[in-house]
Amino acid sequence: MRLNRVGITGGAIYLALGLLWVWLASPPGPAWLLVAWFAAVALVEAFIPGEANQVSFARAHLAAPAFVYSVSPGHLGLLAVVLAVAGLSDLVDGTIARRFHRPSTLGGGLDPVVDGVLLGGVAIGLALGGIFPLWLAVVIVARYLLPAIGGLVLIYLHRRPELRHTLSGQISTALIIILVGGICLFRFMNQDATNVVVGAEVVIPITTLATFVHLGWVARRPVTTPEPG
């Protein structure tokens, strides 16, 4: 892969916004770690083509403030806002890809990676703060980690994994964002979040299992020639 103008531009914009957030918000924790995260993501982004993929990278950058707010109980309202923005970016990147007829295998592989980084970090942070059940955080991490491991196994077996969006995966991610964001919002407003937590404990494992079954079924089928990009 080589440097890409769209990727460099997108990474520079996100890096500037990240540095501005660190300066204005003075978030808890070492500032240099946050700056290093934004810089590292921007560096990777510089090699990734496509406008839709740049929108997807917003979620990788948002992982830093999301994790910081998830381990700070007084910032759960801001975490809910970050998750709402992340969910919006998930809608926008797909819309851009379809609008300009540029869906790609790269985008199909990138989305679950950035979603896993964002939502896995949030789930772990909330579990560490006692806001979220630890076992459910493990389920969310596994939701994104196990398919990635499965893809690596297929590559090791000299099979090309089919990188594309699946309906079950999109529904699973959307519900995780909605339910986790809802828990944060209820706790921030000092409202009883028991029903939302119970809903998450039922819905997230079911949709995760459905995603695994769907991905396993897709992996059994012959791989068609992927689109470039």
Q: What residue ranges belong to the model's regions?
A:
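Membrane-embedded alpha-helical segments that form the functional core of polytopic membrane enzymes
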Residues: W32-W37, A42, Q54, A60-L106, ...
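A feature for the membrane-embedded catalytic helix bundles of lipid/isoprenoid biosynthetic enzymes
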Residues: M1-N53, V113-G229
